[in-house]
Amino acid sequence: MLTDRVLTLLAPALRASGAIVVDATVGLGGHAAAVLTAFPHVRLVGLDRDPDALERSGERLHGLAPGRVELVHAVYDEVAEILDRLGHPVVQGILFDLGVSSLQLDTDDRGFAYSRDAPLDMRMDQTRGRTAADVLNTYDADALTRILREYGEERFARRIAGAIVQARAVTPFATSARLADLVRDAIPAPARRTGGNPAKRTFQALRIEVNAELDVLARALPAAFDALAVSGRLVVLSYHSLEDRLVKRQLRGYAEASVPPDLPVVPEGAGPRLRWLTRGAEPASETEKAENPRAASVRLRAVERTAPNPDHTRKPTGGAS
């Protein structure tokens, strides 16, 4: 199971007395509870941008491990600032479980699910920011085409964007069912019969845009890596190819020497600063996919920090674009 694999990967870094682990996307606290149970001496810092999820996980985790849990309402690219504020500038383990939580998917009025009619919100933090309806009703056709193509990998992006602009001129978008129907009608009939629900890619693109998910992830990974102690471990669970490619690209920058490849001797401090713990991206087992269909798309990558930052710190390659 994925949780068991996460525990196995984190275990060598969390065995030391006083170890601190960060769950950067604590959600309902499933992974966090497993970590706190498996490692009774570990302290956990949990972050989440969703105040509803944080309230629920707080009830669960504070009861499970009194005095060992600190929960903070924050987006995970704020991890360095949060850890400094809490007095934990260096930690032994960090976990990212990306994407939409079960709570968000299963709560109708959040608007994440294209299979149910709901307000077009899609904010992971409903206390701030623009909604999916705001994006649909204010972005021009070119901007809509761009996000559908880049974030949804939608080959009919321009057709869908044009249909959105035309439809909103009559009535602004407010609910998910209307958008799902429009996408289905905008896509050629043969394409509707393959690849699952035709609205899936459009909803993914809007969600990523509303929550700036790839931009946040591109900032969060370097900050998280810098907060890791030497021998500390970072585990990332991604749920679509855009996330996974970004994770791979960012971390690969730390796995390479920061000198020309033909240099005969690598200077001290210029060598790789991590080693991969996973060979490529690990999927969920077939058993887990059968028990939990939402695990079907997961890709797990993990690394161990092997060296501190050099004085001439080189930023990892990659980014959100």
Curated annotation (Swiss-Prot):
A cellular component term, taken from the record's GO annotations: cytoplasm
Annotated transmembrane regions: none
Any Pfam family: Methyltransf_5
GO BP: rRNA base methylation
Compartments (UniProt record): Cytoplasm
Top-rank taxon, per record: Bacteria
Function: Specifically methylates the N4 position of cytidine in position 1402 (C1402) of 16S rRNA.
Family: Belongs to the methyltransferase superfamily. RsmH family.
Protein known as: Ribosomal RNA small subunit methyltransferase H
Species assigned in the record: Frankia casuarinae (strain DSM 45818 / CECT 9043 / HFP020203 / CcI3)
